[in-house]
From Swiss-Prot:
The keyword DNA-binding does not apply. It comes from Novosphingobium aromaticivorans (strain ATCC 700278 / DSM 12444 / CCUG 56034 / CIP 105152 / NBRC 16084 / F199). This is Putative membrane protein insertion efficiency factor. Its main location: membrane. Belongs to the UPF0161 family.
Length: 69
C-alpha cells in the first residue's frame, strides 16, 4: 500500500505537476511532503499526514516551511 501511494505521488511530480504552474504554498511541495511522510511513517499515518497537508494547501491556508513531523 505504501509503495502504491508513493508511486501515485511520484507520478504526479513527473506528470501534471510539471505542466501546471507551481501552486503549493508550502515547502517542501505537497507531493514531496506526502512521499516523505509515507516513507517515514508508513501508509496509514503517513497517508493521514499527507491528506491533512493537502487540505491545508489552499489560498487561505498557511504557507512557508512545513517539514514532516
Amino acid at each position: 500500500m505504501k509503495r502504491l501511494l508513493i508511486l501515485i505521488a511520484r507520478a504526479w511530480q513527473l506528470g501534471p505537476s510539471r505542466v501546471l504552474p507551481p501552486s503549493c504554498r508550502y515547502s517542501p511541495s505537497c507531493s514531496q511532503y506526502a512521499i516523505e511522510a509515507l516513507e517515514k511513517h508508513g501508509a496509514i499515518k503517513g497517508g493521514w499526514l499527507a491528506a491533512k497537508r493537502l487540505l491545508r494547501c489552499h489560498p487561505w491556508g498557511g504557507h512557508g516551511y512545513d517539514p514532516v513531523p
